[in-house]
Amino acid sequence: MEPIIESFTKIDTSTISDALDKLGIDGQCFGIQSNSVSWKIAGRAFTVKYGPVSIEKGTVGDFIDDVKPGEIVVIDNQGRLDCTVWGDIMTGVAKHKGITGTVIDGVCRDTNRILELDYPVFSSSRYMRTGKDRVQVDSIGEAVSIANIRVRPGDIIIGDADGVVVIPQEIEEKVLAVAIEIEGAEHQIRLATEKGMSLKEARSYFNYHSLQTKGE
């Protein structure tokens, strides 16, 4: 695992979200949730975009053979809730290959199997109807949209019980530095309030609000 990915595994999405706000970056994927609150993922995006099926039907899930261990499959199904693009077979292959997890702007199915294999899937929802003959892969390895957030191949994806955030790779070091600073301030505030300092005083003393405010 890359050192920077390992560092991000230790920071929750709430703190990273605050760091993104501080830097004026939209990276929070609204509505994308974990199918188990116990999962935490961090890795680089392998992007896939689906579109409506054409007259000459294309592939649905063969791209999984090209995903590297440690990567996160990021699927743009344009937020469709009426058919799935991920189920038990894909889950089994991904788990066997050592893929870190899957993020879908759309739905998954075979949830019991996903939970049984303990393979992290983050999605808009769950629905049993197949995507076969309804959608097909339009592109692989190009920029996609997840809940209106742009994701490019290689961007860092973080997911946990509170949702999913996207970190553009060109500013990943800066986001990490700000997140660590915010995390440190929050730790100091907790310690100070446990010793009797008021929350207002602690937040002021450790410049907490400025750490979350863009441009300050």
Which sequence ranges carry the predicted segments?
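Channel- or pocket-lining gating/hinge segments that regulate access to a cavity or pore
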Residues: 163-165
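Feature captures the catalytic cores and cofactor-binding loops of soluble hydro-lyases/lyases
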Residues: 1-153, 167-200, 204-216
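Catalytic-pocket segment enriched in acidic/His residues
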Residues: 160
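C-terminal binding/interaction regions
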Residues: 157
